[in-house]
């Protein structure tokens, strides 16, 4: 059994980790930390976990966590995971960070876009945790930087096109996210009266997931990729629907595009390529680790429109983190994640 600890267990990504791991046949949850709810059972904070995980939440205790765990998930604000990772690596414990601390190849880019500063990677070997690209590297990794939710939806949607040189490197992305993406801390923007029957753009052209997208897309393309990104908050709890507008380098029809995607992702269980004329919907992936991808060719403007849907808390966060854990420990990748989406 893989012994697991979670720092930041009571945020949305933390509790989603517990939901998935509590039914994982190869995992034992040994340690859960929370600054806000320590000494309280997690099932008294989230009654959905009653009988599945009733473990008592504890204060942050590095030594205890590392004496009992094989892997630690950090579901903390940016800037807090590096210290934990350093101590864990010394003791041979693996770390999967759901924040942004280990997503960037260049630490200066992290400092430019994120407020939580720390003293760099300092020799920590980290891997960007998108299995569909870095599976072999993840197998050997000690520290994995779990991708952001928006970048996951965008990179998976665009990767076959960039790999095959079908589109140009200037891409427009429009994404809609459920309010759980804003986290559990209360704010005016995620109040019911502000979100209900309302959809609004935010952080236009300056969202901090932009450099993460550009970093990974550029590596796939072999040239610089620039992304014009507009995220929106939609009146739903979960889900991301990303629409990507790409200029074609040559004439291509939608059936050929389908064949390219179907071949590219034929071995990827969690990627579902929809047939021409069918488009992704967030409800079709709700509560699951799947990514649905669809597309359309606008011949009039020589534009390929790609759409992808994920659950922001699962494939966009905690599910992908568990997928990475499975790979790191040689466990079948689907274990604990072979969940049929909830519909309606």
From Swiss-Prot:
Keywords: Amino-acid biosynthesis, Arginine biosynthesis, Cytoplasm, NADP, Oxidoreductase
Active site: 149
Reaction(s) catalysed (UniProt annotation): N-acetyl-L-glutamate 5-semialdehyde + phosphate + NADP(+) = N-acetyl-L-glutamyl 5-phosphate + NADPH + H(+)
Keyword tRNA processing: no
PROSITE patterns xrefs: ARGC
Source taxon at top rank: Bacteria
Compartments in which it is found: Cytoplasm
Gene3D superfamilies linked: Dihydrodipicolinate Reductase, domain 2, NAD(P)-binding Rossmann-like Domain
Enzyme Commission (EC) number: 1.2.1.38
GO molecular-function terms, A-Z: N-acetyl-gamma-glutamyl-phosphate reductase activity; NAD binding; NADP+ binding
GO process terms (BP): L-arginine biosynthetic process
UniProt xrefs under SMART domains: Semialdhyde_dh
A single GO cellular-component term on record: cytoplasm
Family annotation (InterPro entries): AGPR_AS, AGPR_type-1, NAD(P)-bd_dom_sf, NAGSA_dehydrogenase, Semialdehyde_DH_NAD-bd
One matching Pfam family: Semialdhyde_dhC_1
First-level EC class: oxidoreductase
Pathway given in the UniProt record: Amino-acid biosynthesis; L-arginine biosynthesis; N(2)-acetyl-L-ornithine from L-glutamate: step 3/4
Annotated family: Belongs to the NAGSA dehydrogenase family. Type 1 subfamily.
Role, per record: Catalyzes the NADPH-dependent reduction of N-acetyl-5-glutamyl phosphate to yield N-acetyl-L-glutamate 5-semialdehyde.
NCBIfam families documented for this protein: argC
Protein name: N-acetyl-gamma-glutamyl-phosphate reductase
Gene, per the UniProt record: argC
């Amino acid at each position: 059994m893989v012994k697991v600890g979670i720092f930041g267990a009571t945020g949305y990504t933390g509790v989603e980790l517990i939901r998935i791991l509590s039914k994982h046949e190869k995992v034992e949850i040994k340690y859960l930390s929370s600054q806000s709810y320590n000494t309280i059972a997690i099932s008294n904070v989230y009654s959905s976990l009653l009988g599945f995980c009733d473990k008592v939440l504890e204060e942050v205790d590095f030594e205890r966590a590392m004496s009992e765990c094989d892997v630690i998930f950090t579901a903390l604000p940016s800037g807090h995971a590096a210290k934990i990772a350093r101590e864990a690596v010394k003791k041979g414990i693996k770390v999967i960070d759901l924040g942004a601390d280990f997503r960037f190849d260049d630490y200066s880019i992290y400092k430019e876009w994120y407020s939580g500063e720390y003293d760099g990677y300092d020799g920590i070997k980290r891997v960007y945790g998108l299995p569909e690209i870095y599976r072999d590297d993840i197998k050997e990794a000690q520290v994995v930087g779990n991708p952001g939710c928006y970048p996951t939806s965008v990179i998976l949607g665009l990767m076959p096109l960039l790999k095959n040189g079908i589109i140009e490197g200037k891409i427009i992305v429009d994404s809609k996210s459920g309010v759980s993406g804003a986290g559990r801390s209360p704010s005016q923007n995620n109040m019911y009266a502000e979100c209900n029957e309302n959809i609004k753009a935010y952080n236009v052209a300056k969202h901090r997931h932009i450099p993460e997208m550009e970093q990974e897309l550029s590596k796939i393309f072999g040239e610089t990729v620039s992304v014009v990104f507009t995220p929106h908050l939609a009146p739903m709890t979960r889900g991301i629907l990303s629409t990507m507008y790409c200029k074609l380098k040559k004439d291509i029809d939608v059936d050929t595009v389908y064949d390219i995607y179907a071949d590219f992702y034929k071995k990827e269980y969690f990627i579902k390529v929809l047939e021409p004329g069918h488009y992704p919907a967030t409800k079709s992936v709700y509560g699951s680790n799947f990514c649905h991808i669809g597309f359309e060719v606008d011949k009039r403007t020589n534009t390929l429109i790609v759409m992808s849907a994920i659950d922001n808390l699962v494939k966009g966060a905690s599910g992908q983190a568990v997928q990475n854990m499975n790979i790191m420990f040689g466990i079948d990748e689907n274990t604990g994640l072979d969940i049929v989406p909830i519909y309606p």
